[in-house]
């Protein structure tokens, strides 16, 4: 299978039938579910007298609504308690594996599936969550779906999809010290726009991509959706195989060798034809911070908020809206903007290497006066690994709060929220109005290392100036 793109190969391998109107019935190899988008789907199955078609291909966890301070049951929020209880009942009834609180395997769905070895090259992955594209880091084709589609996959293990075009995003050279995959993807979205990927899958390729760790590749693919793409992926290589080897659900013994041989064949061939290609130079990318109300409104930390005349006319109305909402002026330097809350975590940047990068900044320093800073590991496994390295102690000594795993302040579905006009430095993926729990709260997206720098200084600060320039 040397010719063609990985996307084409995986699509063809999972095609069940061509449907009227041009869509395809696609088999889903792995279905991930959680407590928010699954209750209505299970209820719809029961109404129709249906059962889960392939419970062995369905895996559940709880992440969105869980508190990160105390996870003792019952939760203080009765709605959150009912959502978790409903998930527990549904999984028990249908024979679905649930990685619940205290299991040692609970965490954000897009963190636990890779770390358990569930996500593998050549798979189709679906989940009722926008950032399912994360799993494309392994050479999988992964789609975020809505509740009605969660119902369809539970009932049939397949999904009606329209085939996408493929855009290759080729990145030359290497990222500089202090610059991470988060900066790269924010730069890509800034350059192409939040709608440029509509109708596309993004293939991330080139020397800079090959040099990324698996965890940074997950960050990259996680935010492909923020650029409008339906999914994003990286071709599987030795980095992929080394990450998967020995994980709980990965193939082992002779099956491992067969799997690796097949996985290698899935990578896009040298003669693969792409519908479009865009090139970037990693060496020119600086630590990047969003200044506005979409992930596409980003600038290098050494830049100023763009003036209207510098923008495409189509982008000026939302820029004007962003100036007012964020209380930032055209031409204002982003460095030096004061922050109130600093959040490190999420499915974008809540993995061990993210915490290591932030801890390298925090070590020997202290959170600035008046700043609330907290770290939320992406999973129980991440938390235990970080604690084994002493990272929790580093953060606590620096004045950060060390929390239990969950989605936390990425979104306003749990107790971790902004208040009033607070402004956060956040390692999450969305800076929409009200995203972090306050209707007037403001969000600046950046890498975990940059969040740590903001926490230490009380303002947006170029992490490269703190003499702790590291990448993983």
Swiss-Prot record:
GO molecular function: 3-isopropylmalate dehydratase activity; 4 iron, 4 sulfur cluster binding; metal ion binding
Function noted in UniProt: Catalyzes the isomerization between 2-isopropylmalate and 3-isopropylmalate, via the formation of 2-isopropylmaleate.
Reaction(s) the record says it catalyses: (2R,3S)-3-isopropylmalate = (2S)-2-isopropylmalate
Pathway: Amino-acid biosynthesis; L-leucine biosynthesis; L-leucine from 3-methyl-2-oxobutanoate: step 2/4
Species this protein is from: Synechococcus sp. (strain WH7803)
Keyword Ligase annotated: no
CDD domains in UniProt: IPMI
Gene it is expressed from: leuC
Pfam family for this entry, one: Aconitase
Family stated for the protein in its record: Belongs to the aconitase/IPM isomerase family. LeuC type 1 subfamily.
Keywords: 4Fe-4S, Amino-acid biosynthesis, Branched-chain amino acid biosynthesis, Iron, Iron-sulfur, Leucine biosynthesis, Lyase, Metal-binding
Chain residues that bind [4Fe-4S] cluster: 347, 407, 410
Protein name as annotated: 3-isopropylmalate dehydratase large subunit
E.C. code: 4.2.1.33
GO biological process: L-leucine biosynthetic process
InterPro entries named among the record's database cross-references: 3-IsopropMal_deHydase_lsu, Acnase/IPM_dHydase_lsu_aba_1/3, Acoase/IPM_deHydtase_lsu_aba, Aconitase_4Fe-4S_BS, Aconitase_4Fe-4S_dom, IPM_dehydratase_rel_enz, IPMI_cat
Cofactor: binding comment: Binds 1 [4Fe-4S] cluster per subunit.
Enzyme class, broadest EC rank: lyase
Keyword match Metal-binding: yes
Cofactor: [4Fe-4S] cluster
